[in-house]
């Protein structure tokens, strides 16, 4: 699982460490994913690490 308690953040780093969300969308890194989790009110979850 991914700890998103420190999010949302106003800006994400550009590093590419893809994670796959439960929406079958590939997020570029944990920061981008966690921001989306917060926006979804916690309905978005981690599918797996790596591309979808």
UniProtKB/Swiss-Prot annotation:
Single annotated GO MF: serine-type endopeptidase inhibitor activity
GO cellular component, one term: extracellular region
Residue ranges the record marks as coiled coil: none
List of glycosylated residues: 41
PROSITE patterns per the UniProt record, alphabetical: KAZAL_1 (PS00282), KAZAL_2 (PS51465)
Taxonomic superkingdom: Eukaryota
InterPro entries: Bifunctional_prot_inhibitor (IPR051597), Kazal_dom (IPR002350), Kazal_dom_sf (IPR036058), Prot_inh_Kazal-m (IPR001239)
Intrachain disulfide bonds: 4-34, 12-31, 20-52
Protein name: Ovomucoid
Main location: secreted
Keywords, ordered alphabetically: Disulfide bond, Glycoprotein, Protease inhibitor, Repeat, Secreted, Serine protease inhibitor
Residues annotated as domain Kazal-like: 2-52
């Amino acid at each position: 699982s991914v700890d998103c308690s420190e999010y949302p953040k106003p800006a994400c780093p550009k590093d590419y460490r893809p994670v796959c969300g439960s929406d079958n969308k590939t997020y570029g890194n944990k920061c981008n994913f966690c921001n989306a989790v917060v926006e979804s009110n916690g309905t978005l979850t981690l599918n797996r690490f790596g591309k979808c």
